[in-house]
Swiss-Prot record:
One of the early assembly proteins it binds 23S rRNA. One of the proteins that surrounds the polypeptide exit tunnel on the outside of the ribosome. Forms the main docking site for trigger factor binding to the ribosome. One of its GO terms (molecular function) is rRNA binding. Part of the 50S ribosomal subunit. Contacts protein L29, and trigger factor when it is bound to the ribosome. It comes from Lawsonia intracellularis (strain PHE/MN1-00). This is Large ribosomal subunit protein uL23. NCBIfam families: PRK05738.2-4 (NF004363). One of its GO terms (cellular component) is ribonucleoprotein complex. Keywords: Ribonucleoprotein, Ribosomal protein, RNA-binding, rRNA-binding. The gene is rplW. Belongs to the universal ribosomal protein uL23 family. The keyword Ribonucleoprotein applies. InterPro entries: Nucleotide-bd_a/b_plait_sf, Ribosomal_uL23-like, Ribosomal_uL23/eL15/eS24_sf, Ribosomal_uL23_CS.
Amino acid sequence: MHPTQIILRPVITEKVTILRDSVKKVAFFVHPQSNKIEVKKAIELLFNVKVMAINVVNYTPRVRTRNRRKVHVSGCRKAYVTLAPGEKISFFEGL
């Protein structure tokens, strides 16, 4: 798979902002069939940074109730990337 197909989009939430500032972790939504090795290579290639560790979380699809209606929420795969000391991704700076 091409690196731009593996990394779908960044995750920008309060939790990720706190992790970025304290432990140098950033998060991305990744392709559901990608593995840690592919994600690591894609991040290092696209952003020119050194990756220390990758943690991957799978969110299962589920049905939620909104306004008395059943709504299907699709599942996703999220990768938390720990960067090496001194490394940073310029996209996340200033958020």
